[in-house]
UniProtKB/Swiss-Prot annotation:
It holds the Pfam family Amino_oxidase. It comes from Drosophila lebanonensis. Disulfide bonds: none annotated. It is found in: Cytoplasm. This is Protein anon-37Cs. Keywords: Cytoplasm. GO terms for molecular function: polyamine oxidase activity. Its main location: cytoplasm. Has a non-vital function. GO terms for cellular component: cytoplasm.
Length: 544
């Protein structure tokens, strides 16, 4: 066995012009020559290696596409490690991605991510750590609030029934029954999707706990409300969600997550404080990503811009790149990956993009002129909302389906406000609800409030604020999920970098992180992961 120090010396010499073979390694004269050369060249090699690393840090051109949490975290990490030629291109006129706080009424509202869990899969949440270390920023823990279930048909909803069903549902969300099926060798294929799982298991619980037909019907309605709550987080019908999402990526938020009364976008200040305006450019939608050229296969490097690795924006500007970190939302990749990348992405990666689901959580806020507490004493969860004969329904493919207010999960007063209500919707029809005219939406939610509160004097809102993730060309949706055609393997395939020797095209974003999949923590850690991949490449390269 060759001594490690001698082995390193041999490797250094082989790159200095010496060609050692197994035969002359054990030749005494050769070893004497080698020994003298090592002493003279080791310090020179160290200096040369250090110079090469510093040169790489100064000259390596890195383009980050997208200034959401993944892109900003990647850029921050690269700049901290000295890679000064890093630039971030953002298509919209703002940075932050799904972190989007708006001043509305007397408070700040979140059109994207809202709550920050302290832990993700048992580990500290990196966004929580950022907020915790932000000096002078007011943070609060969400207080546990018991929503008041109100049946629009006047039926009484017993609190003890709500408490029991809520506890049972939390167990289902943690995959409690799925785990039992796996341990017992049960057939998971009969469940097929999350809704099938929820319905199958909840029916067993309802049948066992409530023999009375009326109570059984009410219990089903409460369960249905909780199903819609789960659906509202992902922004899709649960029939589309793979059962693996329950077992691999817990969706339910903690009982007391953290929130920022002055807007979660304060976290962006920490990420951008050392990124200059030249390095963070907004209003730069990307039209083409040339991630591989003929020179990668041994051909001479071409002076023509279109034959170099580069990112081309729709305004005509070109950015040369040694490495490209793509943090485009999954919705954009689904619609444009076939035309964005040159050459085309490998079939395996395109298949992963197609397989993964992308939901559209809808956020709706209403502002009132006078304090809400005059007529709303607690958060409301409506049950049994019916379609009135004079009220328009949601139209899907030319058919009238149902009133959108039947999708309302909860109506709640924002904890930092006296004048703003949040309307939480779930179950489906997210894209259709997002496109409803303002007047229709305001009239129907006011009618629902008056019905639930038995109060025809509930005022009309003064203003409306809502999200538009599915109709924004730069997002085309809001959150990834495991569809029934996808699995954790698709997340791994999407995250794999491309490039024969160097990692040329890298992928980050909440859809590329198994740990924290679909969360802002997953977005941040994925950006750091890909930045570190580039850093590691150059640190290792200096010894090659």
């Amino acid at each position: 066995m060759v001594h490690p120090q001698l082995k390193r010396s041999i490797e250094s010499l082989s790159f200095s012009g010496y060609k050692l073979t197994r035969r002359n390694l054990y030749n005494a004269p050769a070893l004497k020559v080698m020994g003298r050369s090592v002493n003279n060249s080791s310090s020179n090699n160290n200096d040369q290696q250090q110079y090469n690393l510093e040169s790489a840090k100064q000259n390596t051109q890195i383009v980050v596409i997208g200034a959401g949490l993944a892109g900003l975290s990647a850029a921050q990490h690269l700049l901290r490690h000295g890679f000064r030629s890093t630039i971030v291109l953002e298509a919209t006129d703002r940075y932050g991605g799904r972190v989007n706080s708006k001043r509305f009424g007397d408070t700040y509202c979140e059109l994207g991510a809202k709550w920050v869990n302290m832990n993700i899969d048992g580990a500290h949440n990196t966004i929580y750590e950022l907020l915790r270390n932000a000096e002078g920023l007011r943070k609060q823990l969400k207080q546990r609030e018991c929503a008041n279930y109100v049946h629009t048909q006047g039926r009484e909803v017993p609190p003890n029934m709500v408490e029991l069903i809520d506890m049972q549902f939390r167990q289902l969300c943690r995959g409690f029954k799925v785990s039992e099926k796996v341990k017992s060798g049960g057939d998971l294929h009969v469940l097929d999707n999350v809704m099938a799982y929820f319905k199958t298991e909840s029916e067993k619980l309802v049948g066992h706990s409530y023999p009375d037909p009326e109570k059984r019907a009410l219990a089903r309605e409460i369960f249905q409300s909780l199903f819609k709550e789960f659906s509202s987080i992902l922004g899709c019908c649960l029939e589309y969600v793979n059962i693996e999402h329950i077992t691999s990526c817990p969706v339910q938020q903690e009982l007391r997550p953290l929130y920022v009364p002055t807007g979660l976008d304060n976290v962006l200040d920490t990420l951008t404080q050392h990124i200059s305006k030249e390095q963070l450019q907004t209003g730069k939608p990307v039209g083409s990503i040339q991630w591989q050229t003929l020179s990668d296969f041994g051909a001479p490097t071409s002076p023509l811009p279109q034959e170099r690795k580069c990112v081309a924006c729709l305004d005509g500007t070109l950015y040369s790149a040694d490495h490209i970190i793509c943090t485009l939302p999954l919705g954009v990749l689904k619609n444009f990956s076939a035309i964005l990348f040159k050459p085309a992405l490998p079939l395996e990666k395109l298949q992963a993009i197609r397989n993964l689901g992308y939901g559209n959580p809808v956020k709706i806020y209403l502002a009132y002129k006078r304090p809400i507490s005059r007529w709303l004493k607690s958060n409301l969860r409506p049950l049994g909302a019916q379609l009135g004969k004079d009220e328009p329904a949601i139209t899907v493919n030319g058919r009238q389906e149902r009133l959108w207010t039947q999708q309302v999960v909860e109506i709640s007063q924002l904890p930092s406000s006296q004048h703003v209500l949040e309307i939480r919707v779930g179950g489906g029809y997210y894209d259709e609800i997002e496109k409803l005219p303002d007047v229709t939406l305001l009239e129907q939610i006011t009618a629902l409030l008056r019905q639930c509160l038995r109060n025809r004097l509930v005022p009309y809102p003064q203003a409306l604020l809502r999200s538009n993730w599915s109709t924004s060309a730069c997002y085309l949706g809001g959150r990834p999920y495991f569809s029934t055609t996808s699995s954790a393997r698709d997340v791994q395939r999407l995250a794999e970098p491309l490039g024969d020797i160097a990692p040329t095209l890298l992928f980050a974003g909440d859809a590329t992180a198994l740990k924290g999949f679909g969360t802002i923590d997953g977005a941040r850690t994925s950006g750091i992961r890909e930045a570190q991949r580039i850093i590691d490449y150059y640190y290792l390269k200096q010894y090659m």
